[in-house]
Every structure is written in structure tokens, then in C-alpha cells.
């Protein structure tokens, strides 16, 4: 029964999330037959470049050639400095960078998963390498400042435990 209420038809169950399919098809058609393999090669190249250049600052969880993503194991770094993967991710926000996936996969306990896209330039990747090196230096000198990151955003570090236990899903406007 596709009719939920009088005059309303539910399409999602039939066609899935239609706009996701449209975006994927648009991307495929834009790249074309030659562009798709090239994009895949660029994603793999970017991930391996970033992983090898970060090595020494932070260690990869798996020291081998990766595909389009790689995981950094920060457990030794945390023991050494007291700075967690969460602290590093939040610190990246202060540099205008979107933080990577945190604490996934679950088989690595203090990890960050980086997935540089196929469109990232060498300059952008080099900037990420520089920033991660700077965060490493800050951690060795002033770990407390990283525990409080981000500093340059309107809202500072969110209490994630409180947010999960007492979610506020609407904004209270002052009338």
C-alpha cells in the first residue's frame, strides 16, 4: 500500500534515495569511460602519498600499500603524549580541515582513518602533512591545549557524552 494518507504517495520504498542515485549517475557521466579509472588511480595515489609522508610523524596501523584510505594507529602516540585520536581530529578543525573518521575500524583502538579524495591536489596533501606535523610538535610541548581543541570555532569542544544522553534537537529562539 503506497498510500499513507489521502493524497500522499511514498516513493522511498520503491525507488530508494533517488537523489543519491542521480548524483552518482551525474558523477559517472561527467567523468566518462576514461575518467572513472583515472579518478580511482588518483584516489589511490593520494592515499599512499599522504600515508608515506605522514609516516614518522604518526604511524600507519598497517604498513603496506593501501587503496583509497588508510588508518593511523595513535595508541603509541597517546601513551607518549596523552593526546588521543579525538584530540588530533578536533585540532585539525582549528586549521580549517575536516577531521577524518575517528575510532574506526574497531580493531585499532586510537585511530584516524584518512580518505583523501581523487580531487585533492599535492599542495592540499602537503598542507595536511605540515599541519599534522605541527599538531605532533604541539602535543609534545603543550598537550593540554590539544585536549581543549578546537579553539577557533564558535562552539568549542562539545561534551559528546552529554549530547548523546541528553540530545537537544531544536533551537530555543529568544522571543
Stretch-by-stretch model annotation:
Residues 2-3:
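Short, small-residue-biased leader/transition segments that mark boundaries at the very start
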Residues 6, 11, 28-175:
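Non-catalytic terminal extensions of PLP-dependent enzymes
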Residues 12-23:
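PLP-dependent aminotransferase class I/II
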Amino acid at each position: 500500500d503506497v498510500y499513507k494518507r489521502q493524497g500522499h504517495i511514498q516513493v522511498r520504498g520503491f525507488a530508494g534515495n533517488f537523489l543519491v542515485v542521480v548524483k552518482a549517475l551525474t558523477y559517472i557521466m561527467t567523468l566518462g569511460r576514461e575518467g572513472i579509472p583515472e579518478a580511482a588511480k588518483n584516489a589511490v595515489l593520494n592515499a599512499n602519498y599522504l600515508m608515506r609522508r605522514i609516516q614518522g610523524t604518526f604511524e600507519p596501523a598497517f604498513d603496506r600499500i593501501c587503496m583509497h584510505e588508510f588508518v593511523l594507529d595513535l595508541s603509541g602516540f597517546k601513551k607518549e603524549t596523552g593526546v588521543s585520536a579525538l584530540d588530533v581530529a578536533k585540532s585539525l578543525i582549528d586549521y580549517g580541515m575536516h577531521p577524518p573518521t575517528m575510532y574506526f575500524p574497531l580493531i585499532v583502538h586510537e585511530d584516524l582513518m584518512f580518505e583523501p579524495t581523487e580531487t585533492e591536489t599535492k599542495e592540499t596533501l602537503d598542507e595536511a602533512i605540515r599541519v599534522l606535523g605541527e599538531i605532533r610538535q604541539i602535543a609534545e610541548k603543550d598537550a593540554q591545549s590539544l585536549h581543549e581543541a578546537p579553539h577557533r570555532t564558535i562552539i568549542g569542544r562539545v561534551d559528546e557524552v552529554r549530547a548523546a544522553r541528553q540530545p537537544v534537537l531544536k533551537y530555543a529562539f529568544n522571543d
